[in-house]
Amino acid sequence: MEQDNSPRKIQFTVPLLEPHLDPEAAEQIRRRRPTPATLVLTSDQSSPEIDEDRIPNPHLKSTLAMSPRQRKKMTRITPTMKELQMMVEHHLGQQQQGEEPEGAAESTGTQESRPPGIPDTEVESRLGTSGTAKKTAECIPKTHERGSKEPSTKEPSTHIPPLDSKGANFV
């Protein structure tokens, strides 16, 4: 039925792993093995070195010279805090060019008041669609003070005042 020398089929054997390895370790080893496409690209028999003219992507040229572990680390690089801050400042600077000075002052004030432990994504999530910062007092619903006798003109709150020691509401 099937021909063994068919050019469409790539046949390769995978050696069995040692039986003393647990399944998780075997899976890690399997994942680290190169794919057949990588093997064909890197083990070209026409020349001992890779012909750089045949690889159109310059990023791919530099990554092929690295070990698989270096390539894996390179793909997961995240920007540093300094780079993130520069990107956010650049983004805010672009938004400020089309706004009035008051809106620009609000957005820069939010970034300066950010504690160092909070990532910039939380600062960006506080920004409105126009790029100006929402005031945190507007975002947090206010509750009435316990001794207040004034009727509320705002919409009803879901806050329930605590019970006094006898179990009755004290308003």
UniProtKB/Swiss-Prot annotation:
One of its GO terms (biological process) is intracellular signal transduction. One of its GO terms (cellular component) is cytoplasm. InterPro entries: PPP1R1A/B/C. The modification Phosphothreonine is found at T35. Keywords: Acetylation, Carbohydrate metabolism, Glycogen metabolism, Phosphoprotein, Protein phosphatase inhibitor. Residues 143-171 are annotated as: Interaction with PPP1R15A. GO terms for molecular function: protein phosphatase inhibitor activity. Residues 9-12, 42-54 are annotated as: Essential for activity. The modification N-acetylmethionine is found at M1. Phosphorylation of Thr-35 is required for activity. Residues 19-29, 135-157 have a biased composition (Basic and acidic residues). Residues 1-171 are annotated as: Disordered. The keyword Phosphoprotein applies. The keyword Heme does not apply. The modification Phosphoserine is found at S43, S46, S47, S67. Interacts with PPP1R15A. Inhibitor of protein-phosphatase 1. This protein may be important in hormonal control of glycogen metabolism. Does not inhibit type-2 phosphatases. Belongs to the protein phosphatase inhibitor 1 family. This is Protein phosphatase 1 regulatory subunit 1A. It comes from Canis lupus familiaris. The lineage of its organism: Eukaryota, Metazoa, Chordata, Craniata, Vertebrata. The gene is PPP1R1A.
